[in-house]
Amino acid sequence: MKAKVYVMLKQGVLDPQGEAVRHALGALGFDGVEGVRQGKVIELDLAEGTTEATVKEMCEKLLANTVIESYRIEI
């Protein structure tokens, strides 16, 4: 069984990596990009029967810094 966890900085939290990507895209001639938010995708191979609640607990304890990041789970 697989699960994907999408982690992004919360709205209002500065994203210096995203800003660096936006700037680099502009330098490459992609002038239409007004903003970039960078995040991460974590793919988990889970034992059958692992619940979404267990994956949520993983996120809360380790995979996401819930003070500044939000996350979304796909199973």
Question: Predicted regions: what is each one?
Answer:
Residues 2-43, 47-50, 54-75:
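Long, contiguous binding/interaction regions
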